[in-house]
Amino acid sequence: MRFLTSGKVKDIYELEGGRLLFRFSDRVSAYDVKFHEEIPRKGEVLCKFAEYWFRRLPIPSHFVERRADTEIIVNKMEMLPIECIVRGYYYGSMAARVEKGEISMAGGPPPLASRLPEPFFDPTTKSEHDLPVDRKSAVSEGLVTEKEYDWLSAKSIEVYNAMSVAAEAAGFVLADVKLEFGRLGGSITLGDSIGPDECRLWPAEQYSPGAIQEAFDKQILRDWLDGAGYKKRFDEERAAGRPPRPPAIPGEIIERMTARYISAYERIAGRPL
């Protein structure tokens, strides 16, 4: 086993036979800032959620097996340089872009957290700071072909819909999800991992359009950073050419994230962590 790279959340090792090992950690990041604190059992939740979704979803994936509580084995493949985001609700960066006039909506913006008429495919580039990219730009920049873009759009929405049904059955609203794909054996295949770091989960019993929603995902940390003014500070430090300094995450936020990550898995998967 040979160490390859360490990302925001997982460490990746190369195995024999064209396979990789993903080792999920308890590390946490938000707004492209890595924090010193860790979220207990987060890695275990992410690992077991990845296994759950890859086994359940109606699309081939690179998943082979789960080897331990925080490790899965996957087939190695050539990842596509595009992140496939599907939004079912008006929230997050989509709402921010509408407010800034970067994108427009027929009839004007709806109330925050409103359900969109149809799931919206909203991909981004893969870069230090992911940037939205439309079909024309994705093709002209050589990220994917027209045929690949259309396939990714259709399949990403299909995956979102399948996940949404499972989330709804467990009492959650799936607001959006980020997916990644790669080329494996001549076919485009679902890759990376899927869990609370890649989607927004809201408790259905507390869902209320027009307001900030309760989160069972990394949004808990983002909301705290926004409310405490740290998001603004991150932007100012970047504008000044300095790397953002991560604040210490309060213990109460850490405890809430652990509890909600575990609860989300146990409710959706229907089994204890």
UniProtKB/Swiss-Prot annotation:
It comes from Cenarchaeum symbiosum (strain A). GO terms for molecular function: ATP binding; phosphoribosylaminoimidazolesuccinocarboxamide synthase activity. It catalyses: 5-amino-1-(5-phospho-D-ribosyl)imidazole-4-carboxylate + L-aspartate + ATP = (2S)-2-[5-amino-1-(5-phospho-beta-D-ribosyl)imidazole-4-carboxamido]succinate + ADP + phosphate + 2 H(+). This is Phosphoribosylaminoimidazole-succinocarboxamide synthase. HAMAP family: SAICAR_synth. Belongs to the SAICAR synthetase family. Its EC number is 6.3.2.6. It is an enzyme of class 6 (ligase). Pfam families: SAICAR_synt. Keywords: ATP-binding, Ligase, Nucleotide-binding, Purine biosynthesis. GO terms for cellular component: cytoplasm. One of its GO terms (biological process) is 'de novo' IMP biosynthetic process. PROSITE patterns: SAICAR_SYNTHETASE_1, SAICAR_SYNTHETASE_2. Pathway: Purine metabolism; IMP biosynthesis via de novo pathway; 5-amino-1-(5-phospho-D-ribosyl)imidazole-4-carboxamide from 5-amino-1-(5-phospho-D-ribosyl)imidazole-4-carboxylate: step 1/2.
